[in-house]
Amino acid sequence: MNFELTSAYKPTGDQPEAIAQLTEGVLEGVPAQTLLGVTGSGKTFTIANVIANINKPTLILSHNKTLAAQLYSEFKGFFPNNAVEYYVSYYDYYQPEAYLPSSDTYIEKDLAINDEIDKLRLAATSALLSGRKDVVVVSSVSCIYGMGNPSDFYNNVIEIERGRTINRNVFLRRLVDSLYMRNDIELNRGNFRVKGDTVDIYLAYSDNLLRVTFWGDEIDGIEEVDPVSGVTIAPFEAYKIYPANLFMTTKEATLRAIHEIEDDLTKQVAYFESIGKEYEAKRLYERVTYDMEMIRELGHCSGIENYSRYFDGRAAGTRPYCLLDFFPDDFLIVIDESHVSVPQIRAMYGGDRARKINLVEYGFRLPAAMDNRPLKFEEFESMAKQVIYVSATPADYELVQSEGIVVEQVIRPTGLLDPVIEVRPSLNQIDDLMEEIQIRIEKEERVLVTTLTKRMAEELTEYLLNNNVRCNYIHSDVDTLERVKIMDDLRQGVYDVLIGVNLLREGLDLPEVSLVAILDADKEGFLRSHRSLTQTAGRAARNVNGMVIMYADKITDSMRLTIDETNRRREKQLAYNEEHGITPQQIKKARNLSVFGNGAETEDTQKGTRAYVEPSSPNIAADPVVQYMSKAQLEKSMERTRKLMQEAAKKLEFIEAAQYRDELLKMEDLMKEKWPG
């Protein structure tokens, strides 16, 4: 089946050209391309069109679960008749196993698995192994973490067909081998029940039952059934039943693994004893021996993933299987916000290894535990045959990989332009800033001011307050929740000016802000680098009157790059607007986005054409898991979101904190709706 793009929107601006260039590059086998798209230019819609054109299975990689949920919702809307799947970490809570030698503290692994996300992960792998091409998997960095061998998973797929002869008991044993459990009383996901000649299977990757009826040893009927009402949804002539777990193995593989583990245990114990680590040798022997007894008796043990290399039959040091192994050879990877996502992929292996080294050196785990890991960055690169990097400010890595193939998308469907940038002398900069602030206050617009130090932010705030300017400051010393509230108060008009040091991060969306003032813009450093200045200037791009003032005594290379690039984009945007008779439209963003919002529409009053505008922030209802949560699960998720909000604010990631805050409000509303009182 081919991809079928369903949308009321038409490509506008430079979207058609971007779509054509990216499509041509993929079809010609170009290994890496970069889509440099400004905020609000409809990058997601462009990628959806490319996917429809190339008709290849596609992995969309996002750097966090919240944004992945938003992308999942958008692509689900674009491709309602195709397989759009969601693959993120299935842990509601996860405390990894660790050992701290300095305090002789061993931290045992603790976790809580979200059943709904587990279902969605299985649905993703099942869709990929079904052989269909029209599959989009939206994933977090979880896609590079170890999982079961796809060959073992596929070998346990049960293919059935009406009229085929198969002994019912043989069929039931095959279900058990695929890790389905018989439960004739309560039928839950991953279970099956038997009533006479009827076998009901609650598929592990679906919300429906599969009912298989026998006539003797012949399959008489196959149909999907609603698990609550029992009403038939659809009959089938043939069906593939995919396993109930991603980690499949056989009895033979288990026995072989136990033998190899015990051999390696003997060697490692002898090694510890040879270097005088008697206590570590004893600890390792006891722990591994206990694990082997558990595997022999029950088929599993706590921390069995640390023995995954033996079950997979891999050699020491080889990479684990991961989601990328479930894709066919010819597939596309799209890395969203690549300037953040790529460094995250690069960092995963190092963080995992640093934790496990202590576990191995102090006798808690065999050295094979080091092979239960995420992919190294080089391994990921070797598997990523075709990549599109998507970012407003791509890093040097993406540009080098793309070898100059950078597709620009700088025209916004709203007609909004990049802000005007002015450079003014730092002499009397505060007095000049005061005048500019008063102009904005009269227009009921907002101002952002960025300083170099916390002390400067506080002193400037005090000065402005003494001059009757409603303002506040944000930095790491301000209480976590208070920071998020201040951001919201700025939008609501409680404050007219917000002062900060590093508050102007990627994705900070404040349409009311028409002026961004950068003090000491000529002081080179990470806060005044080309990318930082570009991101900072972009905070004024959501307002029709957007303007940036850089206060400096000289123009640095970073300033020059930012100014030249912004002016180049403005010229292109202005020319397009004039050619097509478009008047820039101010974005009107509600304080809290609609729970069911899937994007915004803008009406070009001159042309009457509809254009797709990217949603300005993720919404929690986009996450397919939340609607199915029990009250206890929702309460736990709310507590986790609250902690994430606090952590994000602590790290000065205010846009993330605001997104988590919005999630929390939505979950509170959902709680009141489902369980009033």
Curated annotation (Swiss-Prot):
Domain comment quoted from the record: The beta-hairpin motif is involved in DNA binding.
Record: residues binding ATP: G37, V38, T39, G40, S41, G42, K43, T44
Protein name per its UniProtKB record: UvrABC system protein B
InterPro entries referenced in this protein's UniProt entry, alphabetically: Helicase/UvrB_N, Helicase_ATP-bd, Helicase_C-like, P-loop_NTPase, UVR_dom, UVR_dom_sf, UvrB, UvrB_inter
Location of the UVR domain: 635-670
Quaternary context: Forms a heterotetramer with UvrA during the search for lesions. Interacts with UvrC in an incision complex.
Motif Beta-hairpin per record, residues: 90-113
Keyword Transcription regulation included in the entry's annotation: no
GO molecular function, one term: ATP hydrolysis activity
Helicase ATP-binding domain segment(s): 24-412
Domain of life: Bacteria
GO terms for biological process, alphabetical: nucleotide-excision repair; SOS response
Family, similarity comment: Belongs to the UvrB family.
Gene Ontology annotations for the cellular component aspect, listed alphabetically: cytoplasm; excinuclease repair complex
Compartmental location: Cytoplasm
All copies of domain Helicase C-terminal, residue ranges: 429-591
Main localisation: cytoplasm
UniProt keyword terms in alphabetical order: ATP-binding, Cytoplasm, DNA damage, DNA excision, DNA repair, Excision nuclease, Nucleotide-binding, SOS response
Function, as annotated: The UvrABC repair system catalyzes the recognition and processing of DNA lesions. A damage recognition complex composed of 2 UvrA and 2 UvrB subunits scans DNA for abnormalities. Upon binding of the UvrA(2)B(2) complex to a putative damaged site, the DNA wraps around one UvrB monomer. DNA wrap is dependent on ATP binding by UvrB and probably causes local melting of the DNA helix, facilitating insertion of UvrB beta-hairpin between the DNA strands. Then UvrB probes one DNA strand for the presence of a lesion.
